[in-house]
A protein has these predicted regions:
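Membrane-proximal extracellular "stem/stalk" segments
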Residues: 62-218
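Extracellular/lumenal ectodomains of secretory-pathway glycoproteins
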Residues: 1-2, 67
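Generic serine detector
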Residues: 17-20, 55, 73, 82, ...
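Hydrophobic single-pass membrane-targeting/anchoring helices
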Residues: 203-259
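Non-catalytic extracellular/lumenal accessory regions of secreted precursors
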Residues: 2-60, 119, 161, 177-218, ...
Length: 259
């Protein structure tokens, strides 16, 4: 996988400032939207409040188009448990943001005690080519336009105290800002259109993805600051294990996001 160089090189420094205030979670009527079972079948969504169900040990996948200059925020809320069950599961709810090359940008976890609990991503900057020139992972990760991914995982351990579910889940996604012109690539990415938001993606928000726009990309960034950034293609199927700790360990081994 290749990110093309630029027609004209610009300032090789990260943006000095951006709105890093914790955003207010989006409100409004929730619309039903089941998540996909993997990256290839991730459900398309845009800004809004989305509703589904999640069972212990399950991971849901969503694809979120984010263009140049736009800033993404997301919160996942787990409903209270039914009945009078009591207990506590550490690291029960996990919300993770991946960029278009599937490198981890930010991760939020929350324990569960049977009451309504929410995991919110820490603020990330607007998408900017120059974000690659920083050493801060959650800033550096927002250096591409294109399809970002949100995954929501519920630990299998939740079933020990609160049953097999499923549990109600609300996903609140905000996309702030107007799309801007890109950095001016000198050519096409390989595969094509990897680092842009196309008309189809804008129009398909809220529909279950079929994987046709996936570009068969099992990709990880291995270099992020040079002209013509090369991305390593990885064969195989991406999976997440039942428990969040194992999932995090697997992502660290499989993705090795050094871009």
């Amino acid at each position: 996988m290749t990110e093309p160089g630029l027609r004209q090189t610009g300032e090789a420094t990260a943006p000095r400032s951006w709105d890093s205030a914790t955003p207010t979670p989006l409100t409004g009527e929730a619309r039903p939207l089941p998540g996909g079972a993997g990256f290839a079948g991730a459900a398309f969504l845009g800004q809004g409040v989305w509703r589904t169900e999640l069972s212990p040990g399950q991971t849901l996948f969503y694809r979120v188009p984010v263009d140049w200059g736009q800033q993404l925020s997301a919160t996942a809320e787990l409903d209270p448990a039914s009945g009078d069950a009591r207990g506590y599961t550490a690291d029960a709810l996990d919300l993770t943001l991946y960029n278009p090359v599937r490198a981890t940008v930010e991760d939020a976890g929350r324990g569960y005690d049977g009451t309504r609990r929410a995991a919110a991503l820490a603020p990330v900057p607007p998408v900017d080519y120059r974000n690659r020139y920083t050493g801060i992972p959650r800033v550096k990760g927002m250096r591409f336009a294109g399809s970002y991914f949100l995954t929501v995982h519920l630990s299998a351990g939740v079933a020990d105290d609160f049953g097999d579910g499923p549990f109600g889940l609300t996903l609140r996604v905000r996309i702030k800002g107007t799309a801007q012109d890109g950095p001016g690539y000198a050519g096409q990415s390989v595969p094509g259109n990897l680092f842009q938001v196309g008309p189809r993606e804008r129009a398909t928000g809220g529909e279950l993805g079929t994987g046709s726009g996936d570009n068969a990309m099992k990709a990880l960034a291995v270099s992020g600051i040079g002209t013509g950034t090369v991305l390593l293609a990885v064969l195989g199927v991406w999976t997440l294990t039942a428990r969040r700790r194992a999932a995090v360990q697997m992502r660290a081994r499989a993705q090795n996001p050094t871009a």
